[in-house]
Amino acid sequence: MENFDQIFTLLAEHEGIGLNLNILETGLLNILTLVGILIYAGKDFLGSLLEERKTTIVKGVQDAEDRLNEAQKRLNEAQKQLNQANLVISEIRNETIATKKVLLESEVFGAKKDLKIRFERALAMFKSKERQIFLEIKQQIISLVLKRTVIRAQQAFAPKERATTLINDTINKLEGDLL
């Protein structure tokens, strides 16, 4: 900061800032000559640098365009593969649905068959039980009829001694015939 203060103080003491129009004093000719020599001597060097930079930029742009084209081709190929994959997925989904329907129908058929077999077994068991019950009832009826017949025969012939005598005589005769 002190340097700036000193500069402004010096400028204020010496009439301020002015434009020097003396070309020889200012060194403007020297600067222009130096710039001219640099341009003349360096144009080949600067031209080759600029040309090299231009080719590098053009090559970079072409590489970028090539990569863009390659990426576009890959994108198109990926989209084709995606479409094919979607078709395959749709086919698999349709086949799965058809297989599921077939399995359900076969399960229904199997269930019907199993139910029919169970029903036939139950019907056969029912008929067997029915026959068994019928035979048991028949035996009970025969047994009851025989008991009642014996009871009636005993009631009819018991008070009568003649029936007892007749029975005993018949038995004795039969024993005699058998011997």
Swiss-Prot record:
Cell location: Plastid, Chloroplast thylakoid membrane
Chief location category: plastid
S-S bridge residues: none
An annotated GO cellular component: chloroplast thylakoid membrane
The keyword Signal belongs to this UniProt entry's keyword annotation: no
Family annotation (HAMAP family): ATP_synth_b_bprime
Job of this protein: F(1)F(0) ATP synthase produces ATP from ADP in the presence of a proton or sodium gradient. F-type ATPases consist of two structural domains, F(1) containing the extramembraneous catalytic core and F(0) containing the membrane proton channel, linked together by a central stalk and a peripheral stalk. During catalysis, ATP synthesis in the catalytic domain of F(1) is coupled via a rotary mechanism of the central stalk subunits to proton translocation. Component of the F(0) channel, it forms part of the peripheral stalk, linking F(1) to F(0).
Matching InterPro entries: ATP_synth_b/b'su_bac/chlpt (IPR002146)
Membrane topology of the entry: Single-pass membrane protein
Pfam families: ATP-synt_B
Protein name: ATP synthase subunit b, chloroplastic
UniProtKB keywords: ATP synthesis, CF(0), Chloroplast, Hydrogen ion transport, Ion transport, Membrane, Plastid, Thylakoid, Transmembrane, Transmembrane helix, Transport
UniProt KW tRNA processing keyword: no
Molecular functions per Gene Ontology: proton-transporting ATP synthase activity, rotational mechanism
Species of the source: Phaeodactylum tricornutum (strain CCAP 1055/1)
Name of the encoding gene: atpF
Similarity-based family: Belongs to the ATPase B chain family.
Miscellaneous comment text of the record: In plastids the F-type ATPase is also known as CF(1)CF(0).
Transmembrane domains' residue ranges: 26-42
Subunit structure and binding partners: F-type ATPases have 2 components, F(1) - the catalytic core - and F(0) - the membrane proton channel. F(1) has five subunits: alpha(3), beta(3), gamma(1), delta(1), epsilon(1). F(0) has four main subunits: a(1), b(1), b'(1) and c(10-14). The alpha and beta chains form an alternating ring which encloses part of the gamma chain. F(1) is attached to F(0) by a central stalk formed by the gamma and epsilon chains, while a peripheral stalk is formed by the delta, b and b' chains.
